[in-house]
């Protein structure tokens, strides 16, 4: 929490932007006034009132209790790639201590990694590597070992490949679902800029821009919200909930790079955690995302610069 506050205060942005971010973190107004406006409480009150008016009275909730972003959440990974036979990759994974099976295409959740076929991937020796349920930092450590093996086997990706992340959604309230959909929609322009062009307007990971904020806000059930967003080929896939009790994020490009995977998994974890308390406002800039620390903001700032060339 203190690190996030320091990061916000150090930003080269407006006082109003800092006030909004601190408010969303749950910092009391009097404290915000002390830190940002030299004690001008009225300025803070007016800035927050204008923020609410800009959002048309929407429920941009302050985080009234400190959110715990410790990563102990269940998650899953699907890695689409090519250039290694499934049999060889399975053998190398087993030698590295990773339990894996070679199977036909299926949606069954298994207690082991599975190598399946996927007709949407182009290239030689294509495959999809699907994880079992992973948990927190221990799960990331196992994923890193898998990435070492992918590197050993010279596994490659191209524009037909994606990295899909499932986040456990079993305990989501309907308010969390709405906040999550709205937050991703509002952040979509920012996320698009740190994703390759092939993942910005892709049939297999379509955006949420076709759904109005009002349609999301008025959804009363997960099925109703799913119906308004559409089929599973969207950046946020709610169909995964009925099958796996997860929400699937499909936008990330195919990769075998553990640093990219880790940062994206943690981004999604923090996004989901934040959605339990509120939603990210529309037109939020990368440096203003309330749930990212300074290190992740820098990482995605550099990714954005690299992909803008």
Residue positions per predicted region:
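Basic, amphipathic alpha-helix used for nucleic-acid engagement in HTH/winged-helix/SANT-Myb modules
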Residues: 1-13
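A general structural motif at alpha-helix termini
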Residues: 36-37, 48
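Short, charged amphipathic recognition helices of the HTH superfamily
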Residues: 25-35, 162-164
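Helix-turn-helix DNA-binding helix
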Residues: 19, 41-45
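Short, amphipathic alpha-helical "recognition" segments used to contact nucleic acids or chromatin
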Residues: 10-27
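C-terminal accessory/tail domains of diverse enzymes
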Residues: 31, 42, 49-156, 170-309
């Amino acid at each position: 929490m203190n690190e996030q506050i320091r990061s916000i205060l150090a930003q080269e942005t407006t006082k109003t932007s800092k006030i909004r971010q601190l408010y969303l973190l749950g910092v009391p107004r009097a404290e915000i006034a002390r830190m940002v406006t030299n004690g001008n409480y009225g300025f803070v009150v007016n800035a927050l009132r204008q923020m609410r008016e800009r959002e048309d009275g929407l429920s941009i909730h302050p985080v009234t209790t400190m959110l715990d972003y410790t990563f102990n959440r269940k998650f899953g990974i699907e890695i689409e790639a090519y250039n290694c036979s499934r049999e060889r990759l399975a053998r190398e994974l087993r030698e590295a201590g990773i339990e894996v099976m070679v199977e036909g295409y299926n949606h069954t959740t298994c207690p082991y990694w599975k190598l399946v076929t996927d007709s949407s991937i182009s290239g030689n020796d294509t495959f999809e590597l699907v994880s079992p349920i992973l948990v927190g930092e221990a799960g990331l450590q196992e994923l890193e070992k898998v990435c070492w093996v992918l590197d050993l086997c010279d596994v490659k990706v191209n524009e037909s490949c994606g990295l899909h992340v499932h986040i456990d959604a079993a305990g989501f309230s309907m308010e969390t679902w709405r906040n999550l959909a709205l937050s991703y929609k509002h952040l979509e322009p920012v996320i698009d800029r740190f994703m390759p062009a092939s993942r910005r307007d892709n049939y297999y990971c379509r955006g949420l821009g076709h759904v109005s904020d009002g349609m999301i806000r008025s959804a009363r059930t997960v099925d109703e919200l799913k119906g308004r967003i559409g089929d599973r080929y969207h950046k946020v896939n709610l169909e995964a909930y009925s099958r796996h009790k997860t929400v699937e994020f499909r936008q990330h490009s195919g990769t075998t790079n553990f640093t990219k995977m880790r940062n994206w998994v943690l981004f999604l974890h923090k996004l989901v955690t934040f959605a339990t308390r509120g939603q990210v406002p529309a037109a939020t800039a990368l440096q203003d995302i309330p749930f990212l620390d300074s290190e992740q903001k820098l990482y995605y700032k550099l990714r954005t610069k690299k992909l803008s060339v």
